[in-house]
From Swiss-Prot:
The gene is atg4-1. Its EC number is 3.4.22.-. It is found in: Cytoplasm. It holds the Pfam family Peptidase_C54. This is Cysteine protease atg4. Its main location: cytoplasm. Belongs to the peptidase C54 family.
Amino acid sequence: MFTKYSHHNGYQDGSHLQPFQYQQQTYNQQSYLRQQQQAPQQISYGFNQPNSPTSSSSTPSSSTAMGNSFQNQRQINLQQQQQQEQFLQEQVFYQQQLLQQQSQIKEQQRQKEQKQKTNILNIYKEGKQKIMMSFYNLYRNYPTEPPHFSPSPIWLMGRCYTSKDNNSNNNSNNNQVPQTQPTQLQQSIGIFQNNNSNSNNNNNHNNNHNNNNNNLTTDLIYRPAIESGFLSDVASMIWFSYRKDFPPIENTNITTDIGWGCMLRTGQMILARALIKHLYKENDMVPEIERKKPHSNYSQVLAWFSDYPSKEHVYGIHQIVNKKQAMEKNNRKQQILREQVISLNRGGGGSSKGKKKKEKEEEINDNVEEWLAPTRISNILRQLIKFQHLEDLEMYVPTDGVIYKDYINNLCNNSNTHNHYQIIQQQLQHLREQQNIQQNNNKNNNNNNPTTTTTTTTTATSSNNNNNQSPPSRVPNGYNNQVFDDESLFDYNTAISSIPPKWKSLIIMIPLKLGADKLNSTYIEKLKLLLKLPQSLGFIGGKPKQSFYFIGFQDDQVIYLDPHFVQESVNPNSFDYSNTYSGCIPQKMPFTQLDPSLSIGFYCRDQASFEDLCDRLSVINNCEFPIISVCQKLPDYQIECELVDDYAESETTEMLAITIANGGNNHSCIPENIVVDDEEFIVHHHIPYNPNNNQNNNQNNNNNNNKNNNNNTNQQQTPNYPPKLNTYQPDFSSDGEIDDFTMVG
């Protein structure tokens, strides 16, 4: 019925018994313990009875034995009490283990159910992708023939295609490209061949042809050559569309961009057009012979845009998605830093950054299939160009639709770039000296001698800065205040010596919003004028959730290339790789159907081309409702970031940079537990956080003010820095500079 306690095994835990049996066993154990406690009391009563026969015959030896029995019984009672306490502790322990096991079982069941739901969702997504890949082209009914063109001139990014009757009216145009040789487009048409749509398109084309017989007396001779020349030039342009079965994007199972990559593809098209104009100076409409060469510049450009996760394919979909995630990560990181600084200034503690960072990184990974806006893709491409380190090409994305000429001069003029690096070197040296001053101040404060070293070092530093003073540069103040401990990350001498002394070519992408919900009709004529400019690259935009690459116009119809066509992913080393990126059939739509959000592109080969673009834009702006403005100087409140590498545009970064630049006098707002990536300059400084430093420094400064003159005090406290350029910090949430971006592959 009951098993006694053993030092080796203990009481039986009763886990194998039913609940009632377990309670009965516990009750029996407690009853046995009560009986054992009452037993010594009965024995003592027997010895103490006065009439007992043993009491009369007791001796000293018997009393000693009786005392020993009392001690033994007391020890037995203590042991029993300890055994009871240990038994109760074991019961509590077993109950806790049982609860933990139950919670673990529930957690495993929950994870299993979540995994099943995830698998079902993945199966649904994969099935949806396969269905979309199989029927998307049929659903879109991609045309197999070009649209009908009227006898009016056709404009294609500064080129005019017109009939013989209109030549006399367009001789003054230097960009006119007459076409006299008809060209067959069987190859391009064969890509989109569809039996169902082919007959319908042929019938519609024949009906339109019969209806216009009376108006084609003169045009029948010249229009086929004009249209064929225009279509031939369009077919030679690089065309990107949806792809399927490419290698999965990092940390995902996504192998196609159907439904979400149209803006990404149009951004690739306008950038590829700029690169072709940059590499082919004489004729940017690359002939077919050049396109077939395996080691030509054309093949090199196509390799840059291949959909494979490799560093060689710098403008591929994997790199663009990776850059987008890096930008989102950077924005979230700056937000966390801003929240931490605000909470510390208010007297609060540090936030739980680790958990928030993990949750936000999961959200970033889930946003791979997010549709990009024109502004976003423009800034992503700009940073990819910057990462490629092309020595003779820059990209500029203004934030307010204004081109600042002095800023472009600093960006594209290599002599100014040389001075720019010299200024940065001087500022870095100056900041290191100021940091050493602050460290010496802290040591002297601890030794109760804070005055002498600070004054002499600061004076020497200010004199060195006066001797090495450089002309002002429009570099944002936050960047000048950063300190880089690892100088091996950038070799100034090598970079400066490798820069050729000439003007860099320039790609300009200007994001615009030309209306609220739909395009304002007053801007249509301005868009036509911009498409006529010789520096034009067209513009990207389109309808809501549908992006197109607009390359020209005729009358009130805008001509565009459509990326909504699914093709197989092709290995860049295959023989027919280039064929899948050409042969696009242009389409037309009314200007009134355009979405107001778009991004206009220009390419300037040299300084003369840039000045010509500014002059032409100034003439266009003389009319009402200007779209793009040109200014000579960058205003003080404006910050442009194309000159600055590793610069994060946020109020927190600027505040922390100013704190470091001021010798750490305000780094009470910088917590010790701020954990950021290795690229953040806060980690490089390793600033110790001591909330008492501020008070000690203030007391020491007050003592110095009483002993020294005001001039010396001002010289100690005020470092000699360039004037602050911005009076307020604009919001660059869509234009974040990335300092922790690494290429995929």
